[in-house]
Amino acid sequence: MHIVHTIAELRQALSSSAQPAFVPTMGNLHRGHLSLLKQASTLGDCTVASIFVNRLQFLPHEDFDSYPRTWQADCDALESVHCDILFAPREHDLYPEPQRYKVMADQVLASKLEGSFRPGFFDGVCTVVLKLFNAVFAGKPKGFAVFGKKDYQQLKVIEAMTKQFALPIDIVAGETARDHDGLALSSRNGYLTAQERLKAAALYRQLLSLSQAYQTLRGDKQVAAWCLAAEHNATRRLTELGWQVDYVSVRRRVDLEPPIDSQGQPIAKDSLVVLAAAKLGQTRLIDNLEF
């Protein structure tokens, strides 16, 4: 694996690649990240991972300074899945001066759900992703970038940004990797205490229960009313189990709008996703499930 730190070094390393496949990360890698790398290896002619903890997507009270940096373990993990290039820029490599120009994420898509609890988060994500795309794909006729469905809203925002800027990059969605009890793998799971970890799979179980109950519906006209009741019930159950719930919300997969069409009619089945964010102790977890 070739490790590079500057954009110039990266472009030199990619000089013979016509279609790179890229997986951006913030490090502290787990099996979910590695599954995205394996997926990427089937797409392009060169597999690239990045490790960069992006200051712009952290709010002042969040965990930028304490976010786990596990460099050697990450390098070993990337070697194990035969990653070709690791791009590990230092902050001054991506932000050589204060970042006065930023990508403003589409507010229709980015201001809801995560965006309502983490204002500015998606602007920070889009800004660094566009910088990374420019570093990896400059001069390339085509490329691939793999993002996990676990960060579902982020995936949709990146898809929209890539389309808006007409970038020659296919955004590929990777399935969420889960632990034995269903908990979505996340770098922040390490913040959970042993007792909290035993309780953490309840978030996924509520989403799974909701999706299974949905299968009993007969006719699209029930969808809108059912969703409201299901969201309320899942929130209540999680609260009873000691969670502090930010949201449990059923949305259309395509645009994360409520499950009704422009005329106010319920939309067809099999095109929905339920998204949730909740805090257990001091650890905020997110998850989602398509159905």
Name what the model sees in each region.
Residues H232-F291:
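Phosphate/ribose-recognition catalytic cores of enzymes acting on nucleotide-derived substrates
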